[in-house]
């Protein structure tokens, strides 16, 4: 079984779905879709439905619909559950919640879990923000980790499993990257960026998202979502632009 979306590609931009489906020694029997779906064609926050994949004919089970966690029925025909999604290193991005709940499901149903690791686009040195409080645990803050957690998805999986931060621990294996250094941002990896969601079109979007995403969720100002610069601005009719700019400049924030 494969949990993935359009970001699951090799360095020739071939989908992991196609790679595993065509591999002679692999029997890919099911796909699992996170938020936005396996093919990335579902709007943010909209429920993803169970479908048949048009390209491979495989069943696609939703992990962002009636259930957020794979059921025994979904997992009955698989031996190994593989996770291959490019994340952005921010706690409120839902893919890591999907990964964690899938790891729990794998543990509870006796399935091996494999993470195909990918770079953290903001690097592995930036760790910022408070831990989520107990009464605020949700699908957009599933684990008690900093808002910017400074780990790759494989490293995070190892921590969640090793520190027993989930209800059950799985038989976990991480396929590590070659050549990645913690100081690298995504551009420095030389890899082609595939949008991790419709509103994360560029690798630098991962830098803007943690800053403005929460403001957008509060619903009282625009952060550029729906325009060509998602998360790169904040604006509202009641903002006095020159006064705000003066107050911000007076802080003398470096950069």
Predicted feature residues:
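Short internal beta-strands
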Residues: 27-36, 116
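Conserved anion/nucleotide-ligand pocket segment
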Residues: 136-210
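Glycine-rich oxoanion-binding loops at beta->alpha junctions
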Residues: 48-78, 90
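Glycine-rich, charge-decorated loop segments at or immediately adjacent to ligand/cofactor-binding or catalytic sites
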Residues: 40-44, 114-136
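Glycine-rich, aromatic-lined ligand/substrate-binding cores of catalytic
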Residues: 180-255
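A short helix->loop->beta-strand "cap" motif at the edges of active sites that frequently abuts
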Residues: 24-26, 106-112
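N-terminal phosphate-binding or glycine-rich loops at protein starts, especially the Walker A/P-loop
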Residues: 1-26
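Glycine/threonine-rich flexible loop motifs
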Residues: 87-99
